């Protein structure tokens, strides 16, 4: 289930199979996905659920970055991951590509993916953004990444024109 917009915001943090969460596919770390918040805001807090410790933790994140932008024009970073089923092929997108495309780094978080079910953290003063990019830099086993549920909190909300 590599469809973050369908699964990560359904208020269900219980892992019940790969189809009910985001799975990056194998050989895709580091990798990223982008979401549209629908409003421009300043992120202040995040809570991210991943696979529980009683289950397989190898795909749980150990480091993530959150990036933001106010618009999506010229925001693409290359190369684009190609996937066939659960196999992903490409080389990782370097940080310089994110910066050159106008993405602003909001936060970097080290996560205990092997020893906990979720991470909750405050986000220091961040730039305003509508488009948020989650970049999973590393995972417990380094092959793939899984998220079950996410919650983001922001200060202020400016609707689109």
Indicate residue ranges for each PLM-predicted region:
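Aromatic, loop-rich ligand-recognition surfaces of beta-strand-rich domains
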Residues: 3-84, 115-161
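Extracellular carbohydrate recognition and processing domains
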Residues: 84-122
């Amino acid at each position: 289930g590599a469809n973050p917009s369908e699964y990560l915001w359904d208020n269900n943090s219980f892992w019940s199979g790969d189809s009910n969460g985001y799975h990056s596919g194998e050989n895709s770390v580091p990798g990223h996905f982008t979401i549209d918040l629908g409003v421009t805001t300043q992120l202040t807090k995040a809570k991210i659920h991943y696979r529980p410790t009683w289950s397989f933790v190898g795909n749980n994140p150990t480091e993530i970055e959150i990036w933001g932008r106010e618009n999506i024009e010229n925001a693409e970073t290359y190369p684009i991951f190609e996937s066939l089923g659960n196999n992903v092929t490409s080389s990782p997108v370097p940080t310089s590509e994110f910066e050159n495309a106008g993405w602003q780094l909001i936060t970097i978080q080290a996560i205990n993916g092997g020893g906990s079910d979720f991470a909750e953290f405050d986000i220091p003063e961040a730039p305003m953004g509508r488009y948020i990019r989650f970049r999973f830099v590393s995972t417990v086993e380094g092959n793939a990444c899984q998220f079950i549920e996410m919650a983001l909190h922001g200060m202020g909300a400016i609707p689109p024109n």
